[in-house]
């Protein structure tokens, strides 16, 4: 309302002043026509204009004092009031008001001052006192007349619902200062805390608390909360300035792109930002909106999670740059600033700095950029523009950016500590272009070639040859599990020889290799003669067999040498040796079952026939294989059950050992006397599998006879191969078949002792489960005589 509007009741003289002026400080009469009514007290705590212009508020504490008294110095007080108003107006003109703080104060926000109080929709004033009524000077009759006169003279046509306060100041409407839920609650709390009483019955404030609108002279922008009563004050444009939050928040900024959270994060492909100069000297600026930009993609994995896709913030951190997988010649600006991707959780808070050229980029869609953060180096921007293949039309490969004074690795990373004149070292991937070096299968040293059928070094080759030809009886001082490597291969020759046999080394492999080489040379010579004389037809005397023979198949399926695991450091005993032999025999039976199933034609027999043949012949196979190992390794003088268990004469002298060892030594001595070859041994071993059948015959008897005759012929071929076309072939065939017949007597003696130790529980000799099952099934058949021996010669 107008400050000059009279508040005096009709028929009453003017009062020159207020009685409160002398006792309570300076009194200003805002309304010159006010008579005997409200006076305004300006607190003495703000005596100067300078004190009134503090942090967030330029207002003074205004207190109302309703009294019935009057003073005599009204004119002087009015002059002081006018002077102070003029000073305040000049100060407001000199200083531009802070809109954001004014709006915050008008909404009742706490701005952080120590003496500022949140007062709902009211402004915050220094806490000097509260509104109160002077005791003993109250005239409610005059107050009622002043309020009645005020209500008649201050009606507003625009807003008929607005009300005026008892002080004569217009109350701000809800349209000008909308109330939020928090403001209303805060106002109610302040009313309760500041409400005074006079005599315990009179309330200090009316229901609609009046405030002073000291911000009406300020000009609000179109986005002010006063324009919309339904809008939240927190959405005011006065408090939010996008240009203040990020320098890249422009509408046309090329860095602000849309992206999806399920897409890969790939670098931005930007246009050439190098300023182009016309002939006249003017600079041609390219429009960012005309550039087709790809989407900024984000990716999500176990460690990196992007929460706000596509938001990029630019921070000025100084001359920092980085090498990236881009090509071209130009760099953005003279001074690179850090570019960080929001939402990426990076350890240590590091940022990715793009130092790239965008003249002409060739970025494949399935490749990701490689960043290399480089510490700041004072290098001019003109030096940054130099890279390999510079020029606007030239393209550099991915990650080929180069800087002067640095060598670039082939994988795209640059090393700031290398000299520029030193060539870059090759990458690790390109260094190892060839295959890895081949290692010896025995000692893991570098292999020199394939020796005796196995890839070994020269040392193991010589050792194996000397061990076989010298017929050494190696014994391990430990548990037959010594480590054989390049350094410790000479510590234990027994374990080294065992490892050679496990690898498959064989002296016969060298002879076979020589034969194959001779056949290849002969074939090459025949083809050369044919090419020289095309009209001449040559028929070779014997063509090499292209199909594998039965003997070659038997060589392939031959079981490997097994180890007994016998501890030679413990004193020997007959019980411990026999138990170890039984355990070794059980594993050898399992290997024999696999070997028998691999024999050509044997799996065509009935399954019961296969099991019957194995039950009848398992001791034949064990004894004959033992004789062969003893013949090859000790010339038939020792029994080589395993590389780690060799029965010498001392062990043969143990109780219950000599008689059984004597039968087994007979086999090895016969093989030594006849000088049986490896092919002959393989055929004879197969025939021993087919040497015993039940008396009633097999279910597949005819097929069994055919298979047996096939391997008899194969034994004849092995004899011819060894002796050649000589008259002694039949004699040798007789000798070998005679040895096969003698195996029945040897096996009968061994089985008799085996059955005895199995049935005699007092000896406490252990048998493996599979071997015990076979013996249990075989004992009744032998006791009943239900066995038919297939002999070559009649007795």
Curated annotation (Swiss-Prot):
Residues modified as Phosphothreonine are 171
Q: Where is this cross-link: Glycyl lysine isopeptide (Lys-Gly) (interchain with G-Cter in SUMO)?
A: 297, 313, 721
Q: Name one GO molecular function term.
A: identical protein binding
* Ranges where the record places region Interaction with CLOCK: 504-795
Cross-link Glycyl lysine isopeptide (Lys-Gly) (interchain with G-Cter in SUMO2) per UniProt, renumbered positions: 278, 297, 313
Q: Give the boundaries of each NR C4-type zinc finger.
A: 440-460, 476-500
Feature: DNA-binding region: 440-505
GO terms classed as biological process: adrenal gland development; androgen metabolic process; associative learning; astrocyte differentiation; cellular response to dexamethasone stimulus; cellular response to glucocorticoid stimulus; cellular response to magnesium ion; cellular response to steroid hormone stimulus
Phosphoserine PTM positions: 46, 134, 155, 162, 224, 232, 246, 287, 327, 424
UniProt keyword list: Acetylation, Chromatin regulator, Chromosome, Cytoplasm, Cytoskeleton, DNA-binding, Isopeptide bond, Lipid-binding, Metal-binding, Methylation, Mitochondrion, Nucleus, Phosphoprotein, Receptor, Steroid-binding, Transcription, Transcription regulation, Ubl conjugation, Zinc, Zinc-finger
Query: Does this entry carry the keyword NADP?
Result: no
Glycyl lysine isopeptide (Lys-Gly) (interchain with G-Cter in ubiquitin) crosslink residues: 438
Q: Which InterPro entries match?
A: Glcrtcd_rcpt, NHR-like_dom_sf, Nucl_hrmn_rcpt_lig-bd, Nuclear_hormone_rcpt_NR3, Nuclear_hrmn_rcpt, Znf_hrmn_rcpt, Znf_NHR/GATA
Annotated region (Modulating) at: 1-439
Q: From start to end residue, where is composition biased (Polar residues)? A: 151-170, 185-196
* Modification type N6-acetyllysine: residues: 499, 511, 513-514
Quick check: keyword Zinc-finger in the entry? yes
Q: Where is this region: Interaction with CRY1?
A: 550-715
Describe the effect of residue 481 to R.
Answer: Disrupts dimerization and decreases transcription transactivation
Question: What task does this protein carry out?
Answer: Receptor for glucocorticoids (GC). Has a dual mode of action: as a transcription factor that binds to glucocorticoid response elements (GRE), both for nuclear and mitochondrial DNA, and as a modulator of other transcription factors. Affects inflammatory responses, cellular proliferation and differentiation in target tissues. Involved in chromatin remodeling. Plays a role in rapid mRNA degradation by binding to the 5' UTR of target mRNAs and interacting with PNRC2 in a ligand-dependent manner which recruits the RNA helicase UPF1 and the mRNA-decapping enzyme DCP1A, leading to RNA decay.
Provide the domain comment. Answer: Composed of three domains: a modulating N-terminal domain, a DNA-binding domain and a C-terminal ligand-binding domain. The ligand-binding domain is required for correct chromosome segregation during mitosis although ligand binding is not required.
Protein name as catalogued? Glucocorticoid receptor
Q: What is the lineage of its organism?
A: Eukaryota, Metazoa, Chordata, Craniata, Vertebrata
């Amino acid at each position: 309302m107008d400050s000059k509007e009279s508040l005096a009741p009709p028929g009453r003289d003017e009062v020159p002043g207020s009685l409160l002026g002398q006792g309570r400080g300076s009194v200003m009469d805002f309304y010159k026509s006010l008579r005997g009514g409200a006076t305004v007290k300006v607190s003495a705590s703000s005596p100067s204009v300078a004190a009134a212009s503090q942090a967030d508020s330029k207002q003074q504490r205004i207190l109302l004092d309703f009294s019935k008294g009057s003073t005599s110095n009204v004119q002087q007080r009015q002059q002081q009031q006018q002077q102070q108003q003029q000073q305040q107006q000049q100060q407001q003109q000199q200083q531009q008001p802070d809109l954001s703080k004014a709006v915050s104060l008008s909404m009742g926000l706490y701005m952080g001052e120590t003496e500022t109080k949140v007062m709902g929709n009211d402004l915050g004033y220094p806490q000097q006192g509260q509104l109160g009524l002077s005791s003993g000077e109250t005239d409610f009759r005059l107050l009622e007349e002043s309020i009645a006169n005020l209500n008649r003279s201050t009606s507003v046509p625009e807003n008929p619902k607005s009300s005026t306060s008892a002080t004569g100041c217009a109350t701000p409407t809800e349209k000008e200062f909308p109330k939020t839920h928090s403001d209303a609650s805060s106002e109610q709390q302040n009313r309760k805390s500041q409400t005074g009483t006079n005599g315990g019955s009179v309330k200090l404030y009316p229901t609609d608390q009046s405030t002073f609108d000291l911000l009406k002279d300020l000009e609000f922008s179109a986005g002010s909360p006063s324009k919309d009563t339904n809008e939240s004050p927190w959405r005011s444009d006065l408090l939010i300035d996008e240009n203040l939050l990020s320098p890249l928040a422009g509408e046309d900024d090329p860095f602000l792109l849309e992206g999806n959270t399920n897409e890969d994060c790939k670098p931005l492909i930007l246009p050439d930002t190098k300023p182009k100069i016309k002939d006249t000297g003017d600079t041609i600026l390219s429009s960012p909106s005309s550039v087709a930009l790809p989407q900024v993609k984000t990716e999500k994995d176990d460690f990196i999670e992007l929460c706000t896709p596509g938001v990029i913030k630019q921070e000025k951190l100084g001359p920092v740059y980085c090498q990236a997988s881009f090509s071209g010649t130009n760099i953005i600006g003279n001074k690179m600033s850090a570019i960080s991707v929001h939402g990426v959780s990076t350890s240590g808070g590091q940022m990715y700095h793009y130092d790239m050229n965008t003249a002409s980029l060739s970025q494949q869609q399935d490749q990701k950029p490689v960043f290399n953060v480089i510490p700041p180096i004072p290098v001019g921007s003109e030096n940054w523009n130099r890279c390999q293949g510079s020029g606007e039309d030239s393209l550099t490969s991915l990650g080929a950016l180069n800087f002067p004074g640095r060598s670039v690795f082939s994988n795209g990373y640059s090393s700031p500590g290398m000299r520029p004149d030193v060539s870059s070292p090759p990458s690790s991937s390109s260094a190892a272009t060839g295959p890895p070096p081949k290692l010896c299968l025995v000692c893991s040293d570098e292999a020199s070639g394939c020796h005796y059928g196995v890839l070994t070094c020269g040392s193991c080759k010589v050792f194996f040859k000397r061990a076989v030809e010298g017929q050494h009886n190696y014994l391990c001082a430990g548990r037959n599990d010594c480590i054989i490597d390049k350094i410790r291969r000479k510590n234990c020759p027994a374990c080294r020889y065992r490892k050679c046999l496990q690898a498959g080394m064989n002296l016969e492999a060298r002879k076979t290799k020589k034969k194959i080489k001779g056949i290849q040379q002969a074939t090459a010579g025949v083809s050369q003669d044919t090419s020289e004389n095309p009209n001449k037809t040559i028929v070779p005397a014997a063509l090499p067999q292209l199909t594998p023979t039965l003997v070659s198949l038997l060589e392939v399926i031959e079981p490997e040498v097994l180890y007994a695991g016998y501890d030679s450091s413990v004193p020997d005993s007959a019980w411990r040796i026999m138990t170890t032999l039984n355990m070794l025999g059980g594993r050898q039976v399992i290997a024999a079952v696999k070997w028998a199933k691999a024999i050509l034609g044997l799996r065509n027999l009935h399954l019961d026939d296969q099991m019957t043949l194995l039950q009848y012949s398992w001791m034949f196979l064990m004894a004959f294989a033992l004789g062969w190992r003893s013949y090859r390794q000790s010339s038939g003088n020792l029994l080589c059950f395993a590389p780690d268990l060799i029965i010498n004469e001392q062990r043969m002298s143990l109780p219950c050992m000599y008689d059984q060892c004597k039968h087994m030594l007979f086999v090895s001595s016969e093989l030594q006397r006849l000088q049986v070859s490896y092919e002959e041994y393989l055929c004879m071993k197969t025939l021993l599998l087919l040497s015993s059948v039940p008396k009633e015959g097999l279910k597949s008897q005819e097929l069994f006879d055919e298979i047996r005759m096939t391997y008899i012929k194969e034994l004849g071929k092995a004899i011819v191969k060894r002796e050649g076309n000589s008259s002694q072939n039949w004699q040798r065939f007789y000798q070998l078949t005679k040895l096969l017949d003698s195996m029945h007597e040897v096996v009968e003696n061994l089985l008799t002792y085996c059955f005895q130790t199995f049935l005699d529980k007092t000896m406490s000799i252990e048998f493996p489960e599979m071997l015990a099952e076979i013996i249990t099934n075989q004992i009744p058949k032998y006791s009943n005589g239900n066995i038919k021996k297939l002999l070559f010669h009649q007795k």
